[in-house]
Amino acid sequence: MKNMKIGTVIGLCLLLSFFFGTSAKAESITSPDGQLKLNFSVNAQGEPVYELSYKGKEVIKPSKLGLELKNDPGLMNGFTLIDTKTATFDETWQPVWGEVKSIRNHYNEMAVTLNQKAQGRNLIICFRLYNDGLGFRYEFPQQKNLNYFVIKEEHSQFAMAGDHTAFWIPGDYDTQEYDYTESKLSEIRGLLQGAITPNASQTPFSPTGVQTSLQMKTADGLYINLHEAALIDYSCMHLNLDDQNLVFESWLTPDAKGDKGYMQTPCRSPWRTVIVSDDARDILASKLTLNLNEPCIYEDVSWIKPVKYIGVWWEMITGKGSWSYTDDVYSVKLGQTDYSKTKPNERHSANNDKVKRYIDFASEHGFDQVLVEGWNEGWEDWFGNSKDYVFDFVTPYPDFDVKMLNAYAKEKGVKLMMHHETSASVRNYERHLDKAYQFMIDNGYNAVKSGYVGNIIPRGEHHYGQWMNNHYLYAVEKAAEYKICVNAHEATRPTGLCRTYPNLIGNESARGTEYEAFAGNKPFHTTLLPFTRQIGGPMDYTPGIFDTKLSFLSGDHSFVRTTLAKQLALYVTMYSPLQMAADFPESYERHMDAFQFIKEVAVDWDDSKYLEAEPGDYITVARKAKGTDNWFVGGITDENPRTSAFTLDFLEPGKQYVATLYADGKDADFEKNPTSYQIKKGLVTNKNKMSVKLARSGGFAVSLIEATPADLKTIRKWK
C-alpha cells in the first residue's frame, strides 16, 4: 500500500508537470508586508503561469495566462522569459471625494517580458502586489509583428484552491440587475438558470458564467474577491467557471461581430484584481481598485461637488406618476408631433407645480439638487421599438418651463439635476451630446443622470463591450469640458475610473432600490453590494424609502424589504458621493424625527472605519464627515435579527459628542411592522460602547456630533 501511494504521488507530479511544466527560471515577489506571495514561471509549453498565496495559504493555484487572437497566432504559448524588472512604489494621494481623505498607494511590482520566438513578438505581464491583493495586466509593446490585432478571447485563469462559498450574479453582456445567489462554486451550474430573471436587455452567455466583482469565502476563513480595474478601450471581463476543476477563466464581452477587442500597439489590458484577507472588513476597506487607476487628469476640480438630492423619480417607479405627458400619442416623431394639441394625462410627474414643490422641500431641508425625469418630449414610445431618433435632450414638454423652474430653484438655493435617458440609442445620444450639454449650461444645470435602458443601438452591440465602454468614457470626458458631473445608469459596473475622471460621480450598474417596487430585493442584498458591486466604485442606490409598504398603491404589490431604520443606515453603509432621499416629501413629513438623520448625514468623508462585516450577513461602518469632527455610523443585517456591539474608540480623545441613535423598535419587523423605530440621545466619548438590536432586515444609524457648551448642560450621559 505504501509503494502504491508513492507511485500515485509520482504519477500526479508527472501529470502536473505535463499541464504546467517546469520553468527554466521562476520569479517571485511579495507584498510590502510580506503576507502575500506571487510566483511566476513559464512552463515547458512556453505558457505563462502564476500562483498566489496569503500567509502561506493558497489563494490562486497555478493558473495560465494568455490571449487568443483572431486571424493571428495566439499569445498563449511558445514563450521564453527574457527580462524581469522589479520596483517598489509608495505614495499618498488625495481623492477629490471619497471614503477617506488620503489613500496610500504602496506596492511591489514585477514586470516580466516574454518572447514568442516563432512569431517574433514580445508580451509584457505586469504584476503589482499590495498588502491587500494583486493586480496584473497585459502590456503590448509596439513592434513589427504585433501592430493591429483582434482579440478572440482572453484566457486569464484564476484556479481556486477549494469549493468556496460564492456570492454571484449570472454572467450577462447587458445587465447586472440580478439578485445575488449564495452557493458553493460547484453548485453554480445547477442554480444559474433560475437566477436569470427578466430585464429590459439581457444576454447571458454560459451555464457557469458569473460577473465580477465576485466575492468568495473559503472553508478556512479567507475572503477572496475577483474583479478588474481601469477598464479603458477594452471589453468588460466576466468569469466562466470550469466546475470540474474549479478554475475561473476570463470571458470578454463581444461586439456585434463576435469579436472581443480591436487593439493597436502600444496598448494594454485592464488590471485583473484579486483582493484577499482573513478579515472581511479588509475587503471593504481595500483601495486596490482605485490605486490601479491613473491619477485625476483634470487640473481644476473645484466644480466637482458631492450632492444630496431628491426628485420625482419614485412616483414614476411605483406607478403613481408617469414619464409621458399624454396618452393620445402612441408614435412620436420629434419635431413633428405637436404636444400642444394633445390632452395631458394628468399623471405626468415632471410638471411645473410638482417640481416647484420639490424645490421648496429641498430648500427647506438643505438638499442640493432636485432630479426631474420625464421633462422632455418623446417618452410616449421611448422603449421597446429599437428607435434611433428617440430623444433630442433639449425640448421640454408643454407643462415643464425650463427657464422658470431653474430661476425658481436658484432663488431657493437649489439646482435642478438633468436627466438624459438614451433608450440605449447611443448613436443618437452622441450626435446630440454637445447640444445637450450646452443646453444644460445655458439653463443652470451642472449634473446629469444618464440612462441606457434597452438593447443598444448600433444594433448588436452590448452594454459591456469595448465600443460601449469607449462611449461611456467619451460622455464623461465630454461632460468635463462643460464642467458637468455624470451619474450613469445601466452602464458598465465601475472599475475605479472615478479616480481618473472624478466627474463620474455616480453609477447604478446593479439592482437598486427601484426593484423594491417591482419584485423586491432580498434582505441580504445590501449586505453584499459593498463586497461586490461597490468594489469598483460608489453606487447611486437611492435609499431613504420610509413608506416601505407602498401604502398609496391598491391591490397586491411589492414592498420594500427593510425596516425604516435600515433605510437610514444605508446612507452610511452604501457609500456614494451622490445620495438621494428617494421617497415622497409627504412620507418624510410623517416621520420628521427620523428624517433628521438624512438631513444631517454627510456625503463626503475624511475617514471610514469598518467595525463589523460578513458578506451576506451584516455590515457596520463609521465615517467621519469631511472637514469636521462629526461621525456617522450605520449598521444593517440580513433576514436574521442580531445585536451589533462596538466601541466608539474612533472618536477624538478628550471630546464629548452628542450621540443620536435611530434604531429598530422592539416590535420592528420588515414584513409586519417596518416603520417601528426608536430614537435615543446622550453624551458620549471615545470610551463608550454601544450595543444595538437589529430586527429582521433591520438596521440602525447614529449621528455623533461634537457637543456644544449648551449640549453639555442639557443632555445626559449615554446609558
Mark where each language-model region is.
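Glycan-recognition and catalytic regions of carbohydrate-active enzymes
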Residues: 112, 583-632, 636, 667-673
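C-terminal beta-strand-rich structural cap/linker in extracellular carbohydrate-active enzymes
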Residues: 681-719
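Carbohydrate-binding surface patches
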Residues: 615-657, 700-703
